[in-house]
Amino acid sequence: MNFETVIGLEVHVELKTKSKIFSSSPTPFGAAANTQTSVIDLGYPGVLPVLNKEAVNFAMKAAMALNCEIATDTKFDRKNYFYPDNPKAYQISQFDKPIGENGWIEIEVGGKTKRIGITRLHLEEDAGKLTHTGDGYSLVDYNRQGTPLVEIVSEPDIRTPEEAYAYLEKLKSIIQYTGVSDCKMEEGSLRCDANISLRPIGQEEFGTKTELKNLNSFAFVQKGLEHEEKRQAQVLLSGGVIQQETRRYDEASKTTILMRVKEGSDDYRYFPEPDLVELYIDDEWKQRVKDSIPELPDERRKRYIEELGLPAYDAKVLTLTKEMSDFFEAAVEKGADAKLASNWLMGEVSAYLNAQQKELADVELTPEGLAGLVKLIEKGTISSKIAKKVFKELIEKGGDAEKIVKEKGLVQISDEATLRKLVTEALDNNPQSIEDFKNGKDRAIGFLVGQIMKASKGQANPPMVNKLLLEEINKR
């Protein structure tokens, strides 16, 4: 029997507001434990929540960017459960009237475009953070308690773990472009739970789903889903029954492990939040938020192809993160050739960042620095080999490319007389290479060019060297 996989994702995104959703407590990341909280966050008796309007604006902005319909009437509800990181024993969330519904985004997998529906986007407060010591007790930090979140729930339209990865990448990219969140999984500002079930191909009814947690990277999401897909298939093929449960992905064993039997929404006993009035969002408010949405990745990608003449692949890679795209834009504004700047960002820059496990904000390279380097290559002032030396200096120490080239004497040698002398010396020292080339061994030219580049410390102009080599060989 063959099965169809059905996947739905629940993504929690922390909003980048200066204060919490229902109190004036600040929201910086990395502060000392329990220093960014208040009596409202901790649910002391007699205190009342006050809704942060900016959190509503940010939620609307995210929902609009995800093509959601924005509610005119919305409200907050209490989600009742007890856990040490939830001091009030309830979470203020949205149940039956979310701020956004019926959205969608498009993903690309295997060269094909697919639309993934978004069921809803709703506002809620985050919980605190538990740290398990392993010594029989846990520590709780309430700094995160009350931080504004949006929960984005996809339709069960995802059919493969690869599609799930693509969906998360696209969702993160869109949210980052809006500016409402930095979406850093390592800091907890983007978290994901996955629901997965299998059903026989052709069957309309969904199978019993399991929920996956502890997915702290997109790669873990994909790996966890791949394992769960195999596990469920094995259970079903052996005549077993899938239980509705919550499992976690364990990287060490590369398996999913049972955490608990899954609760349904009824277990939370939702009811309207009595301390907050219903929220009315009129058309004027919606329009103001809509007007504040910047250019999104798909729009920017299209512009790069149509206006800058970039290949579709370049445009896709450059627009995947707002940081890279903004850097590219700034470099082009400073006079860099678009294609050359794209090549450097996708090549040398990305390779360096990956090797060092850094982001663009962590290095000394600036858009002006990259633009200066690209312009020197365009003018023929430096060769591509020398450019790599200059690049290393720029990304590690910063500075001006032209100044570095002059100070270090790295200007490309393009003087014909100087180059002809180097060519003559190389030919005199390597008569066998001349014979090899004349006998059809084209690699001999590459060897001779290498000798000249070595003699010139990489500063000889390669195209001119090739031209002069052929001229001199033909004379012999």
Curated annotation (Swiss-Prot):
It is an enzyme of class 6 (ligase). Keywords: ATP-binding, Ligase, Nucleotide-binding, Protein biosynthesis. One of its GO terms (molecular function) is asparaginyl-tRNA synthase (glutamine-hydrolyzing) activity. The keyword Ligase applies. SMART domains: GatB_Yqey. InterPro entries: Asn/Gln-tRNA_amidoTrfase_suB/E (IPR017959), Asn/Gln-tRNA_Trfase_suB/E_cat (IPR006075), Asn/Gln_amidotransferase (IPR018027), Asn/Gln_tRNA_amidoTrase-B-like (IPR003789), GatB (IPR004413), GatB_C_1 (IPR042114), GatB_Yqey_C_2 (IPR023168), Gln-tRNA_amidoTrfase_suB_CS (IPR017958). GO terms for biological process: glutaminyl-tRNAGln biosynthesis via transamidation; translation. The keyword Protein biosynthesis applies. It catalyses: L-glutamyl-tRNA(Gln) + L-glutamine + ATP + H2O = L-glutaminyl-tRNA(Gln) + L-glutamate + ADP + phosphate + H(+); L-aspartyl-tRNA(Asn) + L-glutamine + ATP + H2O = L-asparaginyl-tRNA(Asn) + L-glutamate + ADP + phosphate + 2 H(+). It comes from the Bacteria. Its EC number is 6.3.5.-. Pfam families: GatB_N, GatB_Yqey. Allows the formation of correctly charged Asn-tRNA(Asn) or Gln-tRNA(Gln) through the transamidation of misacylated Asp-tRNA(Asn) or Glu-tRNA(Gln) in organisms which lack either or both of asparaginyl-tRNA or glutaminyl-tRNA synthetases. The reaction takes place in the presence of glutamine and ATP through an activated phospho-Asp-tRNA(Asn) or phospho-Glu-tRNA(Gln). Belongs to the GatB/GatE family. GatB subfamily. Heterotrimer of A, B and C subunits. This is Aspartyl/glutamyl-tRNA(Asn/Gln) amidotransferase subunit B. The gene is gatB.
